[in-house]
C-alpha cells in the first residue's frame, strides 16, 4: 500500500543518515590520528575485532566519543544480537541505555578491510525489519593514509 511505501521510504532515509554517520565517525578517527600526530593512521581501528576479519562486525556510537572502546566486535554468528540503536527525545541516535531513550528498529554494523598498506575499505550497514520484511542500507568508502 501507499502507506507502507511511505514508511519504508522514511526508514530508508533514516538508515542512510545513520550509515553515513557511521562512516563519518570512522573517518574522524583517521583524521584525528593525523591531527594528533599518532604513530599510525589506524590507531583505535586496527586493533578492533572487525578489522580484517570477515567473520566479525563492530558497532559504533559517535555520541560516546571513545574510539578505543566504543566499537566492539560481534561475531557473524551473533549478528542477530547486534543491539538496536536507541533515540533520545531530541532525535539523537545512540547505544546508551538510559530511561529516556527509546529503542528503534535500526542496527548499525561496521567492517574494515585492508586494501593495501595505505588504504582501508570501510563498510557500514544499517539494517532493520519492518512489517516482517528485512531491509538494509550499505555505505562503503576507501580511506587513505594521510601520515
Regions found by a protein language model. Give the residues of each.
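Low-complexity, Gly/Pro-rich coil/beta segments used as flexible assembly/activation regions
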Residues: 17, 23-147
Amino acid at each position: 500500500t501507499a502507506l507502507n511505501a511511505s514508511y519504508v521510504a522514511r526508514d530508508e532515509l533514516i538508515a542512510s543518515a545513520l550509515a553515513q554517520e557511521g562512516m563519518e565517525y570512522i573517518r574522524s578517527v583517521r583524521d584525528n590520528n593525523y591531527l594528533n600526530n599518532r604513530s599510525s593512521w589506524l590507531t583505535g581501528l586496527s586493533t578492533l575485532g572487525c578489522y580484517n576479519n570477515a567473520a566479525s562486525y563492530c558497532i559504533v556510537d559517535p555520541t560516546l566519543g571513545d574510539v578505543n572502546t566504543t566499537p566492539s566486535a560481534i561475531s557473524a554468528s551473533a549478528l542477530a544480537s547486534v543491539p538496536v540503536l536507541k533515540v533520545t527525545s531530541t532525535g539523537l541516535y545512540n547505544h546508551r541505555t538510559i530511561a529516556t531513550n527509546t529503542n528503534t528498529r535500526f542496527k548499525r554494523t561496521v567492517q574494515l578491510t585492508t586494501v593495501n598498506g595505505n588504504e582501508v575499505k570501510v563498510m557500514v550497514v544499517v539494517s532493520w525489519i519492518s512489517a516482517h520484511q528485512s531491509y538494509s542500507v550499505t555505505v562503503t568508502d576507501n580511506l587513505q593514509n594521510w601520515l
